[in-house]
A protein has these predicted regions:
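N-terminal secretory signal peptides that target proteins for export/translocation
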Residues: 1-3
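Sec-dependent N-terminal signal peptides
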Residues: 5-15
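Boundary at the C-terminal end of the N-terminal hydrophobic targeting segment
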Residues: 16-20
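Transmembrane beta-strand segments of Gram-negative outer membrane beta-barrel proteins
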Residues: 25-32, 83-144, 154, 158-164, ...
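N-terminal, post-signal-peptide region of Sec/Tat-exported proteins
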Residues: 39-79
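Structural signature of outer-membrane beta-barrel domains
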Residues: 132-134, 169-173
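Outer-membrane beta-barrel and related beta-rich outer-membrane complex signature
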Residues: 174-178
Length: 180
């Protein structure tokens, strides 16, 4: 009976797909890649979003290969996003590191500020805080929105990815839609 279960598990595992780390929809990298696509620097298929971080990294690599077509501002943006997607570049290019890299409240190997970052050749973890405040008015009444939380993502080998985005939202004011 156990042999049958093991055989069934192995047979069905061929239909399993690797886990993907998607880039959250509110990130500005989507606008940047869309602009480059409109200029025909790259082809960015983003009709279905979110897209994976690895796909975005591939498009950033394509854009860097055509950097002569970019403005100075676009080159700066490309450099910024390239730092954020360094881990994905390393996975795509199969780059191995000599030892584990740990960053606590500082800049990681990609020169990005992170609360915590860990990476070795088999496992990576990035943890960043989320904090925001927005104040405004609606119908001449004060309205505030405060949010905080954590965003983490990483990879186990190059086949399994994971991400978690937790946010606590607090809205105050007399014009809040409490039914939403």
């Amino acid at each position: 009976m156990i042999v049958k279960k093991i055989f069934l598990l192995l047979a069905l595992s061929s239909f399993a797909f690797a886990q993907v780390v998607y880039e959250p929809l509110h990130r500005d990298v989507y606008k940047f890649l869309s602009r480059l696509s409109q200029k025909s620097v790259i082809v960015f298929d983003d009709q279905i979003r979110p897209v994976s971080r690895k796909y975005i990294a591939q498009k950033l690599i394509e854009a860097s290969e055509k950097s002569e077509q970019l403005t100075s501002m676009e080159k700066e943006e490309l450099e910024f996003y390239s730092r954020d997607f360094k881990f994905e570049f390393d996975i795509i290019n199969n780059i191995k590191i000599d030892s584990s890299q740990i960053t606590i409240a500082g800049y990681d190997a990609g020169d990005r500020l992170r609360l915590f970052s860990y990476r070795n050749n088999f496992f990576s973890l990035n943890l960043s805080p989320i904090l925001g405040y927005k104040a405004g008015s609606l119908d001449d009444e004060k309205l505030t929105h405060f949010w905080n939380g954590l965003y983490t993502y990483g990879y186990i080998d190059k086949y399994i990815g994971y991400s978690f985005d937790f946010r606590d939202n607090t809205e105050t004011g007399n014009t809040i839609d409490k039914t939403k």
